[in-house]
A protein has these predicted regions:
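Positively charged n-region of N-terminal signal peptides that target proteins for export
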Residues: 1-4
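Sec-dependent N-terminal signal peptides
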Residues: 6-11
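N-terminal signal peptide c-region/cleavage motif recognized by signal peptidases
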Residues: 16-18
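Acidic, small-residue rich beta-repeat scaffolds with periodic aromatic anchors
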Residues: 21-39, 44, 54-59, 125-183
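Entry beta-strands of beta-propeller and related beta-repeat scaffolds
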Residues: 49, 105-110, 152-156
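Beta-propeller domains
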Residues: 63-74
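Surface-exposed loop and turn segments in beta-propeller and other repeat-based domains
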Residues: 73-90
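Long, charged/polar, surface-exposed segments that mediate recognition or autoinhibition
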Residues: 96-135
Length: 183
C-alpha cells in the first residue's frame, strides 16, 4: 500500500511539474536610424508584417503597425519614445522586436524594446489579430531607460533611472492576453 501511495505521489508531482510554461524567444529584429528618419517594412512571419517609422534627433520616436494577410485588422502603436544615444555628433535610435512563444499554450507575443521605459510594449498575436498586451507607459512613475529579459519561467522589465534599477516581473493572464507588472 505504501509503495502505491509513493508511486501515486511521484506521478502527481511529475505531471504537475510538466505543465509549467517556458518562454522561448526567436531571433530579434533590430532596426536603427542615424540622425534622421527612416521607414522599415519587415516580415515577422510568412503572413505577418511590421511597418516602422523611426526618427532620431533631439528625441527618438517610433510608429509601428502590425498587420496580417489573413485579416484587415491592424495594431498601431504611435509616437513611442525611443532612446537616442549621441556618439561622434550623431543621434542614433534603435528599436528591437523580439518574438516570444509560451510553450505551454503556443501563445505568441512580440517584445517591443525602444530603450525608453515609456516605449516598452508587448504585443500579442492570436487568431490572426494583434493586440496590445502590455505598455510600460501605463505603470505609475516609470521613466528612464528600460530593457526586457526573458528567463525560462518569467519575463522581466528592467527600468533604470538616475542609477537606480527597478525590476518588474510580468505575469500573463491567458484569458485576456495581457501582462501585469509587479515590482
Amino acid at each position: 500500500m505504501r509503495k502505491i501511495l509513493l508511486t501515486a505521489a511521484f506521478a502527481a508531482l511529475t505531471l504537475a511539474s510538466s505543465v509549467s510554461a517556458n518562454w522561448i524567444t526567436g531571433e530579434p529584429t533590430i532596426l536603427a536610424v542615424n540622425s534622421g528618419e527612416a521607414a522599415f517594412h519587415t516580415a515577422l512571419t510568412s503572413d505577418q508584417r511590421l511597418d516602422v517609422n523611426l526618427t532620431a534627433g533631439e528625441e527618438g520616436k517610433a510608429d509601428l503597425t502590425f498587420t496580417t494577410k489573413a485579416s484587415e485588422s491592424a495594431l498601431s502603436l504611435t509616437a513611442l519614445p525611443v532612446l537616442v544615444s549621441e556618439e561622434a555628433g550623431f543621434a542614433d535610435a534603435k528599436l528591437t522586436i523580439t518574438p516570444l512563444v509560451n510553450d505551454a499554450n503556443g501563445l505568441r507575443f512580440y517584445l517591443v524594446d525602444t530603450g525608453e521605459a515609456g516605449g516598452a510594449h508587448i504585443v500579442s498575436y492570436k487568431g490572426a489579430a494583434f493586440k496590445s498586451a502590455f505598455s510600460a507607459a501605463e505603470l505609475q512613475d516609470v521613466t528612464g531607460t528600460s530593457y526586457f529579459t526573458v528567463e525560462k519561467k518569467q519575463l522581466l522589465l528592467h527600468v533604470n533611472e538616475n542609477g537606480t534599477e527597478d525590476i518588474y516581473t510580468l505575469s500573463l493572464d491567458t484569458k485576456s492576453l495581457t501582462f501585469t507588472a509587479v515590482k
